[in-house]
């Protein structure tokens, strides 16, 4: 797998299946990386077939202590961009969760990281996991973690920045939560971004329903940024319950 060093959102990524395809794919990825990020740096890594994209939420403090807040499964993607996220992962076992959590905490403490962060892994069908990257910020999908462990990540990040210490306790899901990204796109035109004015906006609600957004009726979606305009999150006692709520809200 070829990847851009400054990449994100699937830009500058190419899978190479044959050695004679490497040079062409490298040049193509490099050009895309330069156009997208102004940086032509590239690297290669092992290609994992049929991977699961599973990330571990971590928090570290100024004393060098870190904890994890379990995983998020971000495997449902389009063009290497996340569409839905959930926790706990239906692919996970308790053993794998503990192993990945321990690895994430060890890495976080080794670099003396402070604040909330996410360590992302690819997991193969045999449940071997491979480090991809660390996102040193709050993730778009952080609400599902907050919902299942009753933990305010934003508040915790502010406390850590103020010098407070974390408890050091690792957290595990008590509920099931799913997030769907709401994008301003045209499904009849290859899902291209569709900027413009929102004439009417109706917000869903109810028990176990959360909507994070900045838009409103009359808001004009600009053409310059990512097409995501909202995040719809449902939480229930079971995965089936969270899915049922989500389907009822988006009218599928």
Region annotations inferred by a language model:
Residues 6:
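Functionally critical, cavity-lining and gating residues within the transmembrane helices
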């Amino acid at each position: 797998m070829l990847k851009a060093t400054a990449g994100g959102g699937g830009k500058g990524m190419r899978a190479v299946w044959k050695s004679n395809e490497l040079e062409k794919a490298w040049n193509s990825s490099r050009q895309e990386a330069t156009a997208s990020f102004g940086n032509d740096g590239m690297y290669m890594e092992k290609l994992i077939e049929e991977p699961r994209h599973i990330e571990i939420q971590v928090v570290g403090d100024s004393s060098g202590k870190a904890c994890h807040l379990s995983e998020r499964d971000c495997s449902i993607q389009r063009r290497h961009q996340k569409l839905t996220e959930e926790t706990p992962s239906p692919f996970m076992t308790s053993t794998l969760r503990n192993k990945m959590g321990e690895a994430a905490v060890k890495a976080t403490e080794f670099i003396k990281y402070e604040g909330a962060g996410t360590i992302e892994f690819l997991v193969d069908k045999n449940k071997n996991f491979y480090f991809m990257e660390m996102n040193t910020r709050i993730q778009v999908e952080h609400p599902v973690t907050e919902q299942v462990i009753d933990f305010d990540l934003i508040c915790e990040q502010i406390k850590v920045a103020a010098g407070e210490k974390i408890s050091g306790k690792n957290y595990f899901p008590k509920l099931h939560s799913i997030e769907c990204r709401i994008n301003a796109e045209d499904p009849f035109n290859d899902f291209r971004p569709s900027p413009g004015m929102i004439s009417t906006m109706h917000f869903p609600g109810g028990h176990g329903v959360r909507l994070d957004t900045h838009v409103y009726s009359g808001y004009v979606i600009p053409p310059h940024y990512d097409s995501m305009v909202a995040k719809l999150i449902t939480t229930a006692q079971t995965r089936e319950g969270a899915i049922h709520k989500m389907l009822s809200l988006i009218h599928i």
